[in-house]
């Protein structure tokens, strides 16, 4: 492992992403992605990387993993026609944690499009690190929404990476178990999933130490079940040795890191005690392996801390040091009273004793010893890329272009979007009963009003500062909106790999309980 610090970094962002609104009181706020973007612009980080507007993923791209019927449902459902879809909403688990809101399908298209385009960029060796903070929606299943996630952009990105890379490692540092990604690849030895998460009476209720994969995928699912209060030192003490052993044993050709920020201290739904620096150390450590590296977002419900975290981790990817003093930005008042980048841990007790963590580590090392070193994989003919960068449909944008007033007028922020009084953050009430932080779904559970933002706030988006929709000082090519994948051949041609998770959402202990089917992976 060498530490070559400077790498080519590509960053995917669409300025519309912050307009989507899950509804009053819902903890998931896509606006955090716009806050992150604005902060990294004002730090000047945009000058150091290529910035692309992602294409909107097509239905054909989404059905590389998701069922045709589920994607058709997502395309059709709207707040004004929900009454026509009552049975399907129940079947696809849409309506509570995963509400129907204006632009739902387009939101899914942008999230998935960024991760797929990033994977294509890595496959073409046009970048060493790609970032999509709008992705990381790790709970979505083949035919089911779950935990605020509708389309699993991570699975789609990994399937794209598998066209060129024999083995892909997925690492998840969200406070919640990465169940959707694990389930999708539970029976293959080409993808290893490693999830560090809170376990025990906590959503989604999966991710036991004994859940290790099935069939050819046995021992290729790695779960690190943690307790409340996980702090920086404890996290590093288990993350570094486990990822080191995984790298040595699995020898991946590419890595995907889900950077869920709900593992930070003070998160509205989380229960860990990590600082931004402690969270960022995971990015720093994985980066040192010099592998094609896809970084995606995920959870994070104290949104000022989410934007702090992802801005800092963008700087880590770029190997650029940034000041602790926050630059003035469009959301500056929400970072008070200190207006600093880094946050301090709370005084909560760390319930993860060194003995407990050592026991977990030793058990996982025993499992990893069962693996052959660098399993051989027969690579078939490489299918066409999901994105054709050289088509005439390229969306060329200039970083320093100012958007027209009509685009400004579309940007609306609901009242109280950032208010601590709405349960958010340090010192606020933490009434999470109706949300995933407190819900535990059955482990083998089978799938069985307009929320549009309505008013502008005084914190109107200032597009003059949004210079980041292109490459620095020159035009940057956005991904083509046309997919070249043929959905009729998707089962056979995804580099011999298609994730075929069963539609259930649970995870079993040991072999066979996932219901994932193997299909040439």
Curated annotation (Swiss-Prot):
GO terms for cellular component: chromatin; cytoplasm; ESC/E(Z) complex; histone deacetylase complex; Myb complex; nucleoplasm; nucleus; NuRD complex. It is found in: Nucleus. The modification Phosphoserine is found at residues 391, 419, 421, 455. Residues 476-502 have a biased composition (Low complexity). Disruption phenotype: RNAi-mediated knockdown results in loss of type II neuroblasts. Residues 376-521 are annotated as: Disordered. Residues 7-319 are annotated as: Histone deacetylase. Catalyzes the deacetylation of lysine residues on the N-terminal part of the core histones (H2A, H2B, H3 and H4). Histone deacetylation may constitute a tag for epigenetic repression and plays an important role in transcriptional regulation, cell cycle progression and developmental events. For instance, deacetylation of histone H3 may be a prerequisite for the subsequent recruitment of the histone methyltransferase Su(var)3-9 to histones. Involved in position-effect variegation (PEV). This is Histone deacetylase HDAC1. It comes from Drosophila melanogaster.
């Amino acid at each position: 492992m060498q530490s070559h610090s400077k790498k080519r970094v590509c960053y995917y962002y669409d300025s519309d992403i912050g307009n989507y609104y899950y509804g009053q009181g819902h903890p998931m706020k896509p606006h955090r992605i716009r806050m992150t973007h604005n902060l990294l612009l004002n730090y000047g980080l945009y000058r150091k990387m290529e910035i692309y507007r992602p294409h909107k993923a097509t239905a054909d791209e989404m059905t590389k993993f998701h069922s045709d019927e589920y994607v058709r449902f997502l395309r059709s459902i709207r707040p004004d026609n929900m009454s026509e879809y009552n049975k399907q909403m129940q079947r696809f688990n849409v309506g509570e944690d995963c509400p129907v809101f204006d632009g739902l399908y387009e939101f899914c298209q942008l999230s998935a499009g960024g991760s797929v385009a990033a994977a294509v960029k890595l496959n073409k060796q046009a970048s060493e690190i790609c970032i999509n903070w709008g992705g990381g929606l790790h709970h979505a299943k083949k035919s089911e929404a779950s935990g605020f996630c509708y389309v699993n952009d991570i699975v789609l990105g990994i399937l794209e990476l598998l066209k060129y890379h024999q083995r892909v490692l997925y690492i998840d540092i969200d406070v919640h178990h990465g169940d959707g990604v694990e389930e999708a690849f539970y029976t293959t030895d080409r993808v290893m999933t490693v999830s560090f998460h809170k376990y025990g009476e906590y959503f989604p209720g999966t991710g036991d130490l004994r859940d290790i994969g099935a069939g050819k995928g046995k021992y290729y699912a790695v779960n690190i079940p943690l307790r409340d209060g996980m702090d920086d030192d404890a996290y590093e003490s288990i993350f570094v040795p486990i990822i080191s052993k995984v790298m040595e044993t699995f020898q991946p050709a590419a890595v995907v890191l889900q950077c869920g920020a709900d593992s930070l201290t003070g998160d509205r739904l989380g229960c860990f005690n990590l600082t931004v620096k402690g969270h960022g150390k995971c990015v720093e450590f994985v980066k040192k392996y010099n592998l094609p590296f896809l970084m995606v977002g995920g959870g994070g419900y104290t949104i000022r801390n989410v934007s702090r975290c992802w801005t800092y981790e963008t700087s880590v990817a770029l190997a650029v040091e940034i000041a602790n003093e926050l630059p003035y930005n469009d959301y500056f008042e929400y970072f008070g009273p200190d207006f600093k980048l880094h946050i301090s841990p709370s005084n909560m007790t760390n319930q993860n004793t060194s003995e407990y963590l050592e026991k977990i580590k030793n058990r996982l090392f025993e499992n990893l010893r069962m693996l052959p070193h660098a399993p051989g994989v027969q690579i078939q003919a490489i299918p066409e890329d999901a994105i054709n960068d050289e088509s005439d449909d390229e969306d060329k944008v200039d970083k320093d272009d100012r958007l027209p007033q009509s685009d400004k007028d579309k940007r609306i922020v609901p009242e109280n979007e950032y208010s601590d009084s709405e349960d958010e953050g340090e010192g606020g009430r933490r009434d999470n009963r109706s949300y995933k932080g407190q819900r535990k779904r059955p482990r083998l559970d089978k799938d069985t009003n307009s929320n549009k933002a309505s008013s502008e706030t005084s914190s109107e988006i200032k597009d003059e500062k949004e210079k980041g929709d292109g490459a620095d000082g020159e035009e940057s090519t956005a991904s083509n909106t046309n997919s070249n994948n043929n959905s009729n051949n998707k089962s056979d041609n995804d580099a011999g790999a298609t994730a075929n998770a069963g539609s259930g959402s649970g995870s079993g202990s040991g072999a066979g309980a996932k219901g994932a089917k193997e299909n040439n992976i």
